[in-house]
Amino acid sequence: MVIIRAKHMGFCFGVLEAINVCNSLVEEKGRKYILGMLVHNKQVVEDMERKGFKLVKEEELLEDIDDLKENDIVVVRAHGTSKNVHEKLKERKVKVYDATCVFVNKIRQEIEIANEKGYSILFMGDKNHPEVKGVISFADNIQIFESLEEAMEVKIDSDKTYLLSTQTTLNK
């Protein structure tokens, strides 16, 4: 039997960068948190806990039932987060280290610009995924679909301008 190892394995560079951001903060004084799961990997999450990071859920933050205090350190995961959460972090006066993947940020910026121009936005992705919840929160007029079948049902107005975008981690 011959086993050939793939050239590219492991985490994407966005996740690696988020892990690097956390590792660079290990020696910082004060309480350290990660907003949501840094990555969908139990070993990495446990490693970050051993290094002193605690998990804070977006829902807890938005409902003010978390234990964040002014000047605590909060790392935003590679998937990013919603507009409301960004505003809440600013309001809470915590030190934010935004480790959102550059590709996710690029999509978010494109959506924000299209939204400001009054475009309608068509977005393919898993509406329950943290990345999608985050990027779509920056638009007012957005239609989300998860499959080609759902996309075929979208009503298109030929008089409108549309931006078509997709989740970076889409597996379909």
Show which residues each predicted segment covers.
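The feature marks the mature, well-folded catalytic cores of soluble enzymes
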Residues: 1-172
